[in-house]
């Protein structure tokens, strides 16, 4: 597994899982703020730029990260955070290993299957995938995602490096993911975040996670879009993480 690493001299480890179609730069600003106190690891998710594996399933990627934590971190870390696809992988990790982290931040994780979206992904991306490497199209897509302008070059580089099959695979997995009952065994103190301007199914997902995870709190962020917090407001993300850990 390929990953970026910060603060290697510190014992307490935080793992941050980026969103689908993005890369470790999603959480770079957070890592730079945390590295003077914590060991921060940002893996490249399967099927993404810099990854050494194709994407197969959310469950497989979750198992890979669990194995990494077992091998490199003695089976437990201080905190895991995840956005969108990374948030779904985090939910799956918590469902499979209830005590793998003491704290968790789940941001904008969809946990209800969207069957129509799932059915449309392959035909839609088979047609439009060649456009992804076009600079003008990438710019339009980037603008629609509301990502900070200074990330465009990295976004363009990394999204262009994703193969068509990998992109279809992780988008279909994202739209098909269903919450497992074992999430109720999670022992991590968990903060669940969703943007106030996200879709109704995203808010429903956040509310369901809050209901299912015993020691959890839910924050709906007024005026925020999908992924807005971790991508565009790193200082606030770190403040929320520190508050979660210290309280």
List PLM regions with ranges.
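Acidic catalytic loop of the alpha/beta-hydrolase fold
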Residues: 197-201, 227
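Conserved HGGG/HGGXW glycine-rich cap/lid loop of the alpha/beta-hydrolase fold
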Residues: 4-50
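Gly/Ala-rich beta-loop-alpha elbow adjacent to hydrolase catalytic centers
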Residues: 82-86, 90
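Catalytic histidine-centered segment of alpha/beta-hydrolase-like enzymes
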Residues: 224-236
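Flexible "cap/lid" loop of the alpha/beta hydrolase fold
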Residues: 95, 101-131
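Active-site loop/oxyanion-hole signature of alpha/beta-hydrolase fold enzymes
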Residues: 41-81
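Short beta-strand/loop motif that positions the catalytic acidic residue
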Residues: 186, 192-194
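Conserved alpha/beta-hydrolase catalytic His-Asp/Glu region
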Residues: 115-117, 132-184
């Amino acid at each position: 597994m390929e990953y970026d690493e910060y603060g290697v001299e510190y014992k307490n480890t935080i793992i941050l899982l980026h969103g689908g179609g993005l890369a470790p730069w999603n959480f770079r600003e957070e890592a730079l703020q945390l590295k003077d106190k914590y060991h921060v690891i940002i893996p490249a998710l399967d099927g993404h730029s810099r990854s050494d594996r194709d994407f197969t399933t959310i469950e497989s990627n979750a198992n890979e990260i669990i194995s990494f934590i077992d091998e490199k971190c003695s089976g437990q870390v201080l905190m895991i955070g995840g956005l969108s696809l990374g948030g779904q992988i985090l939910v799956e990790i918590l469902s499979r290993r209830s005590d793998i982290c003491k704290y968790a931040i789940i941001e904008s994780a969809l946990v209800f299957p969207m069957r129509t979206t799932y059915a449309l992904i392959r035909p839609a991306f088979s047609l439009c995938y060649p456009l992804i490497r076009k600079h003008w199209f990438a710019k339009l897509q980037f603008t629609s995602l509301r990502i900070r302008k200074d990330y465009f070059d990295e976004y363009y580089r990394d999204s262009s490096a994703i193969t068509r099959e990998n992109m279809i695979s992780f988008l279909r997995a994202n739209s098909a993911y269903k919450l497992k009952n074992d999430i109720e065994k999670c022992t991590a103190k968990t903060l669940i975040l969703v943007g106030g301007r996200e879709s109704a199914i995203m808010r429903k997902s956040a509310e369901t996670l809050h209901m299912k995870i015993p020691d959890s709190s839910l924050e709906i962020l007024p005026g925020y879009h999908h992924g807005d917090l971790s991508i565009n407001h790193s200082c606030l993300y770190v403040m929320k993480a520190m508050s979660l850990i210290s309280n």
